[in-house]
Amino acid sequence: MTSEVSRRDFLKASAAGAGFVLTFRIAGGATSAAEAAGAWEPNTVFTIDPSGIITVHITKAEMGQGVGTALAQIVAEELEADWRDIRIDYPTSDPKYGLMLTGGSWSVNWTFDALSRAGAGARHLLIEAAAKHMNEPASECIAEGNRVRHLPSGKFLTYGDIVSKGLITATLSDEELKKIQLKKPAEYKVIGKWIQRLDVPEKTNGRAKFGIDRFLPGMVYAKVIYPPTRTGSKVVSVDDSEARKVKGYISTVREGDIVAVVAENYLAAVAAQGKMRVTWDKGPHANVTTDSITQDYWNKAKNDTSAPSWVDVGDADGALAKSMKTHEAAFWTDYVGHAPLEPMNCVARYQDGTFDFFSGSQFQTRAMGDLSKLFGVKPEQIRVH
């Protein structure tokens, strides 16, 4: 696995390549904890348990944009699920989920077809299984609201019934999956409709867990001493004599130009961080400021004719040349930091040959590659939660 992936490479990726490989498994030998518990997990997208609860596995990071609800809506639409029975979870990183990346407003775009076919394919198998059990033609049965109903007689089986009885014994090939006719927008009952976001209740009652909420037995706390510039700063010297006097101080860690202090608890780490004395060579970017960055881009916008234009419609130069009067205006927006409201954090654990990392990451796939390279281990020894 490589971590050398650029934004240009992302944009080149197709929806299929960036999404999922959908393989519908035959029920029988359990291949996951969910299936071992009697649930049906036809693919990497969702699980239906014996009670009929459908859990959609969200592999995109929830950053306030509602992506968990949006992706669950896509599955629920084609699955003909009752929205009240839909749940979501956020699985640990795994190559089986494909590219685990969130950004650029790509989540729905990249996964729409794959998620739709995951739901539609499962619906097809549920109908076939229920029809066979009821001894009725599948052509006379429909799926609606988490159940399969035989239209002439009114007989029905819920999805939970079908799963708990282990009735699904068929599978779908890739070709069959591709041939399934998806709904037209005019037929949507869930997509595009006002719907309560699935992540809001836990975020309002305090049950939602963020990276910073992770606590492990015996964990210690580290605080990084940040350099004075974004890039280019080099450590000249480190004086931790005062930091060592802080109650709870454990050690000072230096890896190249990264310096951190480790302590028994968070407050001790903060106190020790404040007493660290690091001398820096600020390097070539010592005088870079928001004003200098702004001026640099302003000069490029006015004078660099090779720079690409965001909008290029018509003959602006020709129109200006013919105009009796012209008006020039500059529009500015504040410099915005690309950072979450939650303080940046990561909890790491090494146990039984596996590294576990708990963090609010929007690019789990790259994290696995970078971390495996950093620690000199195989990517499968890295788990990003």
Would you name each region that the model predicts?
Residues 1-385:
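Structural alpha/beta core scaffold segments of enzyme domains
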